[in-house]
Amino acid sequence: MALTKKQRAELRMKFGSRCAYCGCELSEKGWHADHVEAVLRKSEQCMKAAAKGIFKLKATGEFYRPGADRLENLFPACAPCNLLKTSYSLEMFRKQVSLQVERGRKSSMNFRTAERFGLIEAVEKPVVFWFEQYQEGTAS
């Protein structure tokens, strides 16, 4: 759904001009309108690229879930959160966020070094999204 400038401005303010997920401040430009329930965009193979032996997909502009493409299903999100969330449900996204520390520990020598020197301290706690805190009035 293409948002008008007014709708986009209102959506940005939905949670106090912050990302619905991590709570970072959203500038006027550069943030994403995230479909909370994914619309799942349809794509097809680009035959022009295929003729050159390249596999490339292109969006058709259609959705597998067109009913999810509505204003009430949009949250303001920073680009990193929206790109990590992809088409996950909220609970699957929460799970993905909770796995990040262990993934960093497994795959990043920089993370392990910083942790060993006390520069990073992993904390076991549930992932609570900004919009949940905002709606409960506990956001700070």
Where do the protein language model's features map onto the residues?
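Histidine-centered catalytic micro-motifs used for acid/base chemistry in nuclease
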Residues: H32-A38
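Compact nucleic-acid interaction/catalytic patches
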Residues: V39-Q45
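The −1 position to Zn-ligating cysteines in a subset of zinc-ribbon hairpins
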Residues: S17-R18, H32, A77
